[in-house]
Amino acid sequence: LRNIVKTKIYYKFLRGNKNMWIVFSILSAFFAGITSILAKIGIKNTNSNVATALRTIVVLFFSWIMVCIVGSQGTIPTIDFKTWIFLILSGLATGASWLCYFKALQMGDINKVVPIDKSSTILTILLAFLLLHEEITMGKFIGVALIGLGTFLMIQKSQNKANKDDKNKLWIMYAIFSAIFASLTAIFGKIGIDGVESNLGTAIRTSVVLLMAWALVLFTKQQHTIKEISRKELLFIGLSGIATGVSWLCYYKALQDGLTSVVVSIDKLSILVTILFSIVVFKEKLSLKSFIGLTLMVIGTFCMLLF
């Protein structure tokens, strides 16, 4: 009985506290930030494509929970043919981005891969300007410049380490392709996905990602490696999917109750969480140059959001 009373009091607190959306925003950024950390642990010895396919099952579960929460599943029959095409294209781009991202994570340092992936914002803005004729404000221009410079500084390595890693720079290619496909996801959404509730669109795209990921696993005949995955890595692969799902739930709750501009700004700070945990968990070092780059990326992000 005491536990029931405590639960009711806590629930009333969540509903009654007008500033709880800030807490949910912070939680959203936290869980988004640790997703890469959990995934990195989970793909140490596991094929990254297999890991992506497995974690997408968990992510898909959460994405449809979101749809049920907002009640948009009933609008599926109203989606027209053109929108379906762009939803599928967006899903394929998302899938390609995820596959490249986790491959890059497996091969490279988190504090190098994540900034490149986050720089997809730059390409998205440029493509929107060229293809959709969207205006680039001074705030966006400054933000793009700062994020670009910050990314460049963060991926720089000392000369000794650069010489050592000359033979293994494939992670850069995968990280760049991850950013490119992430940008295409946004562009496809802008071009052809009109009138579809955002959570439903995410669920449909994630369904496409799941099919794509498993098709790749079957095509490359990697399905037999699933039974070879250690319990530890399987656990962390699942936890990375759960972290993504919980981040989405917190983000939605924060958007529902709070100021959109502030919620988005806090969520963008997930890169700070990722970098911090990469230092603590993987002992990755953040040089002065990388620290300056990270600072520029954060400032650039706020420039685009606030101006």
Question: Language-model features: where?
Answer:
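Hydrophobic core positions of alpha-helical segments in small-molecule transporters
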Residues: 27, 54-55, 89, 116-119, ...
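Hydrophobic/aromatic residues within transmembrane alpha-helices
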Residues: 42, 51, 104, 130-132, ...
